[in-house]
Curated annotation (Swiss-Prot):
Pfam families: Radical_SAM (PF04055). Belongs to the radical SAM superfamily. Anaerobic sulfatase-maturating enzyme family. [4Fe-4S] cluster 3 binds at C331, C334, C340, C357. InterPro entries: 4Fe4S-binding_SPASM_dom, Aldolase_TIM, Anaerob_Ser_sulfatase-maturase, rSAM, SPASM_anSME, Sulphatase_maturase_rSAM. This is Serine-type anaerobic sulfatase-maturating enzyme. It comes from Klebsiella aerogenes.
Length: 405
């Protein structure tokens, strides 16, 4: 009689999982939309999506097949856990996941884990797990206490600022690497410098600013983000980061990724890649989708147990939303196309234009100013580093600070 458990322990595949010819990631939502907060702008509200927790059998199937389907030669495999609030899955869930990763990881391949949380449930036990296994934590936070408590209350409408800061303090105490993620909406546009200063005062070394997605609860609550306000806010962050000479101390992902993309011609973000579709999303029941912000029938790829992952990735990258994102007419002559690439398809309006286009143009135009004299290759990168990195030159370069925000 076939001993399934023994085969798994020996890493003998139950069925051949073909490798994907292209690199891909799957953002895993083990608890679906379940969350202990009631953010007013949530793009993934619980009342629109059934709440389930991934069972152990599907967790094992996902980890085994996700590892097996990576392209030949992959040296690192990253698992990304998100929600809702993924910590609601429980400590034991992630211990099982880590054990399965160790069981199925081939020799010489590094397994890494990233997790996005609101921070309010973090305790010492979680931090010990994160530290021991090298988790990279993303912590979602508003720019200050007043914004946090209004826009990100708990289920009873109560303040969450102190609980989130307690989570940040614990991450510091346990020396867990983390970044702070801020969702930007119109109300924040005039307060970029103050928000930046407050985040840095919390000891954050990595910051990421994400434009509001006009979907889910955000639509019902009337949240908006205009192109003007997106550009105004991000230029404000850029100016404050430069004014404080924080390069090397504070890593603003929006800036650093664009700078790297200018020289390397590749993006670390699907939003600013020439094509997208290789960052899939999986719900607790095994449903796969082509994009975290396009959870609908048009972008549904089927269930995990209905197909190979290579087939799902191939179907995803062939969808028009990812193939055509940087091919719109207005992008072809744009001076910042090399780092924008049309932005996220989820921000397209009814006319097929990116609602944030003008904001991206303003922000990228400003931050690319110090790079323009250098060639877009490794030699240019070396020359730019020699001229700017490790000096105060980028703090005082002739940028348009006299132009009002």
């Amino acid at each position: 009689m076939l001993n399934i458990a023994a085969l798994r322990q020996q890493q003998i595949p139950l069925a051949a999982e073909p490798r994907s010819p292209v690199p891909f990631h799957i953002l895993m939502k083990p608890i679906g939309p379940a969350c202990n907060l009631a953010c007013r702008y949530c793009y993934y509200p619980q009342d629109e999506t059934p709440v389930n927790k991934m069972d152990d059998a599907r967790l094992e199937q996902f980890i085994r097949r996700y590892i097996a389907a990576q392209p030949a030669g992959a040296r690192e495999i990253n698992f990304v856990w998100q929600g809702g609030e993924p910590l609601l899955a429980g400590l034991s869930f992630y211990k099982k996941a880590l054990a399965l990763q160790a069981r199925y990881a081939p020799d010489g391949v590094t397994i890494s884990n990233s997790l996005q949380t609101n921070g309010t449930l973090i305790n010492d036990a979680w931090c010990r797990l994160f530290r021991e296994h090298g988790f990279i934590i993303g912590l979602s936070l508003e720019g200050n206490e007043a914004l946090q408590d209004y826009h990100r209350p708990d289920k009873r409408g109560r303040s969450t600022w102190s609980a989130a800061l307690r989570g940040i303090d614990l991450l510091h105490q346990h020396q867990v690497d983390f970044n702070l993620l801020v969702v930007v909406h119109n109300e924040m546009a005039a307060h970029a410098a103050a928000i930046y200063d407050r985040l840095v005062s919390l000891g954050a070394r990595y910051l990421q600013f994400q434009p509001l997605m006009s979907e889910g609860a955000a639509l019902r609550e009337g949240y908006q983000l205009s192109a003007d306000n997106w550009g105004r806010f991000m230029v404000g962050i850029w100016r404050q980061w430069r004014k404080r000479c924080d390069r090397g101390r504070v890593f603003v992902i929006n800036i650093e990724q664009a700078w790297a993309q200018y020289f390397t011609h590749t993006s670390g973000s699907c939003v600013h890649s020439a094509r997208c579709g290789s960052n899939l999303v999986m719900e607790p029941d095994g449903q796969l989708y082509a994009c975290d912000h396009l959870i609908n029938a048009e972008h549904r790829l089927g269930r995990l147990d209905e197909q190979t992952l290579a087939a799902a990735v191939d179907a995803s990258v062939q969808l028009p939303f990812g193939q055509q994102k940087s091919l719109r007419r207005e992008c072809q002559t744009c001076s910042v196309k090399m780092v924008c690439q049309g932005g996220c398809p989820a921000h397209l309006n009814a006319a097929g234009n990116n609602r944030l286009c003008g904001g991206y143009y303003r922000f990228f135009s400003d931050i690319l100013a110090p790079l323009r004299p250098f060639s877009r290759d490794l030699n240019g990168l070396k020359a730019w580093r020699a001229a700017f990195v490790g000096t105060a030159a980028y703090c005082v370069a002739p940028y348009p600070d006299d132009i009002p925000l």
